[in-house]
Amino acid sequence: LSVDGHKTLNTPYDCGIILCNDREALVSSLQATGSYIIYGEKRDGMLYTPEMSRRARIVELWATMKYLGRHGIDDLVYGLHARTIQFAHELKDSGFQVLNDVVFNQVLVTCENDDITSKTLELIQESRECWCGGAQWDNRKVIRISVCSWATTSDDISRSVKAFVKAYNEAKRK
């Protein structure tokens, strides 16, 4: 299992987490080899990371997790998911086609054709109400939404949806 600490916990980019219950598989996939390497008798950190010399990346991740605690992380993850589901439902109710099952914090939406989808995305970005990006899905242009800030509220989602609707209506007129 891998988790992106940056996307979920808003830690620096290089704070990924790997959970593996097979110690031998983890070590063999990450271990550097060389006759010059001196291994310690205790748990050696270089056996569990893809490089041997690195800064203490774990500090930011550890501090965030320590501050939030189990319940804080739980509230964050479930809160992001709830707001993402809200985003998907409000967009669907407003006439957008939601293409994915919302399993965490991503929504893919499209309009009736690629041209209107592209224009809608451009107008949403120009509005500066929220940020989303474009992508391709099944040979169609889509708008990719990622709800990833702990500070995002239900009202923020509704305001963002209003920006989507305004942009969509304007794109259809052009």
Feature roles, as predicted:
Residues 2-94, 99:
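Active-site C-terminal subdomain of aminotransferase-like
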Residues 63-64, 108-109, 143-147:
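Short, hydrophobic beta-strand segments
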Residues 94-97, 129-134:
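A short linear hydrophobic-aromatic micro-motif
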Residues 96-124:
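Conserved PLP-binding catalytic core of the aspartate aminotransferase-like
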Residues 100-105, 136-142:
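Short Gly/Ser/Thr- and Asp/Glu-enriched loop/turn motifs at secondary-structure junctions
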Residues 118-126, 158-165:
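Short amphipathic alpha-helices in soluble, non-transmembrane regions
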Residues 124-132, 165-172:
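A common structural junction motif
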Residues 137-174:
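PLP-dependent enzyme catalytic core of the Aspartate aminotransferase-like
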